[in-house]
Amino acid sequence: MAPAGHPGAKRGILERLESGEVVIGDGSFLITLEKRGYVKAGLWTPEAVIEHPDAVRQLHMEFLRAGSNVMQTFTFSASEDNMESKWEDVNAAACDLAREVAGKGDALVAGGICQTSIYKYHKDEARIKKLFRQQLEVFAWKNVDFLIAEYFEHVEEAVWAVEVLKESDRPVAVTMCISPEGDMHDITPGECAVRLVKAGASIVGVNCRFGPETSLKTIELMKEGLQRAGLKAHLMVQPLGFHTPDCGKEGFVDLPEYPFGLESRAATRWDIQKYAREAYNQGVRYIGGCCGFEPYHIRAIAEELAPERGFLPPASEKHGSWGSALDMHTKPWVRARARREYWENLLPASGRPFCPSLSKPDV
C-alpha cells in the first residue's frame, strides 16, 4: 500500500469515531524533549513552547508525518499552580504550535489539561475547577477542535475536569493513569469510566504510567463497566512506550529506572504493531501513546492499521513493511531478517549481562 497522506476533508473527532475511523494520537513530549535538552525533569513543565518553539514544532511534525491525526497541545502541567504568571502565555503558544502543524495534514487540535499538583493536599473543588477553567478559556480563544483531560489518578478530580470542560461546546475526552487495580482510592476502572461518562465525557480511557499490555487490561475493565451500566462512549488508549509489568499501582514512577534509565524497557516497533492490533480488536478506535512513545512507534500504529485506514503515513516511504527493506542488505544473515516471523518472535537482549529482567518498585 503506497503512502497517501490523508483522505478527504477534516472532520470532527466524534464524527470520525462514530464512523468507525481509526484516530491515531501523538506520543511522548515531556520525556522526549527532556532527552533532547528542552524540558527539565522534576516539575515537567512545558516552557519549551516559548523558549524553544522550533523543538516543539519539530516534534509535532514528526508525529504528524508518522501518522498522528491529533496534535495535542503541549500543555501538560501548564496550569497556574505549576507555572504561576507564565501559564497563559504557555497555553496560548502551545495552541498556536499545534494548530500550525495540524494545518499541514488531516489533524485535529486537542487542548489538554491534567491533574493538578494541589488535589492530593487540598481537595478544594472550587480552586481546582478555577485552574481548569483558566486553561479552557485559552483553548476556547484559540479555537481548539476538542478537549482532553489526561493523567488523572483520582476519578473525583477527573470528574471535576470533565465538568469544567463541558462548559464549552467542544467534545471532551478523558484518560486516567490507572492500572487494573483502579484509582488511588481503589475505585475500579469500570466505575471510573461510568462516572466520567455520566459527567459528560464522550471518550474515555487511560494514558501514561503503564505499558501497552497493562493499559489494555485496564481498558477492557472500563469497557465492561460501561456495558454493565448501559452506557456508551468511545474508547481511547495512550500507554507508555515502555514495558512495565513489574511496576506497582503508581506505575512507572515507582520503578528505580524512572526517569533517566528507562531505555532498556523501550518497546520495539513490532511490540507496538501488536499493541495497535490488540487495541483495535478490543474496540478501541482512538489509539496513541504517551511517555516514551517516539514517532517511529506512532508510525507502527499507522502501518499496522493501514488496511483499516486505507493509507500509509508519509514516514512509511522510507520504511519497508516488517523489515522488507533488508532484502537489499549485503549480508545474507541480515537479509534473512526481512520477514514478519523473525521480528514478531524476536526476544531482544539488553546487552547488559548483569541486569535483571525485572525490577523491584521503590514503593
UniProtKB/Swiss-Prot annotation:
Cofactor note as given: Binds 1 zinc ion per subunit.
Cofactor(s) needed: Zn(2+)
Catalytic activity as recorded in UniProt: S-methyl-L-methionine + L-homocysteine = 2 L-methionine + H(+)
Residues noted as binding Zn(2+) in the record, renumbered to the chain: 208, 290-291
InterPro entries registered for this protein in UniProt: Betaine-hCys_S-MeTrfase_BHMT, BHMT, HCY_dom, HCY_dom_sf
EC number: 2.1.1.10
UniProt keyword Signal, yes or no: no
Domain Hcy-binding: 11-305
Main enzyme class: transferase
Associated pathway: Amino-acid biosynthesis; L-methionine biosynthesis via de novo pathway; L-methionine from L-homocysteine (BhmT route): step 1/1
Any GO MF annotation of the entry: S-methylmethionine-homocysteine S-methyltransferase activity
Gene Ontology cellular-component terms listed: cytosol
Assigned keywords, A-Z: Metal-binding, Methyltransferase, Phosphoprotein, Transferase, Zinc
Summary of subunit composition and partner proteins: Homotetramer.
UniProt function note: Involved in the regulation of homocysteine metabolism. Converts betaine and homocysteine to dimethylglycine and methionine, respectively. This reaction is also required for the irreversible oxidation of choline.
Protein name: S-methylmethionine--homocysteine S-methyltransferase BHMT2
